[in-house]
Amino acid sequence: SLVGSEMCIRDRKRVLFSVILLLAAGFTFAQEKTVKEAKSIANEVNPDFNKAEQLINQALTNPETKDNADTWDVAGFIQKRINEKQMENAYLRKPYDTLKVYNSALNMCKYYLKCDELAQVPNEKGKIKNKYRKANTAAIVAERPNLINGGIQYYNLEKNKEALDFFGTYIEIAQNPMFEKENFLQTDTLLPQIAYYASLAAAKMEDYPSVLKYAPYAQNDKEVGQYAMEFISTALKAQGDTVKWIASLKEGLQLSLIHISEPTRLLSI
């Protein structure tokens, strides 16, 4: 009968829907297993980092796992282990790769920052349960100086894009909520210098948005502030923003007058 046929069709749809749900659950489980396997490999005494990175890179792009904080936490952990192994070789006076030390530090920082961003998203009850922040903050703070070393190394190799990546990440850490207690914007005396080098690397590539992003962190510094203002003015002129360009020239002139008058004022006291 017609009713019987409709019921039969509905039952088939229900079965099909159940199969799809089971398949989806299976794919999710498989990807989560991949993440755990990647972490397990990285934790071994002699880790196969190529295998661990291959597995985690799949998870970082897979729709089932790419939005999970845990995926990015494991990605950061793998880079941390790569860094530790290189430093272990250095300590034992075995051959080690300096650039690998710097790049693993950079990648670790980026992955942990992304992990924190995802972990700060409220759950279905509107609560934030970020179990990663404390350990990952400590790891980033410990490795942050290597971002300067890596940036300088690439800058000296005239690889401005890579240098900017290092210097830019160093600056972005300073303003990230993860590091509220460290208060880097106020306590980090190297920040203006690194912002200057970030702006310089960006200016060499004519990457004016990056110049305007990083140069302001250096503009009030006594040593490099005037150069930072020149970078800002050049970038604004290149972008055709005449009003802001003229304003930046005036500001740059005022800063240079302040810096010129300060030694004179000290001599007159």
Language-model regions: role of each:
Residues 30-34, 104-107, 142-147, 187-197, ...:
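Generic helix N-cap/helix-start motif at coil->alpha-helix transitions
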Residues 1-11, 258-269:
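Single conserved hydrophobic/aromatic residue that forms the stacking wall/gate
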Residues 37, 75, 82, 150, ...:
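Structural register within alpha-helical repeat arrays
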Residues 31-87:
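Start-of-domain marker
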Residues 78-195:
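Short coil/linker segments at helix-helix boundaries
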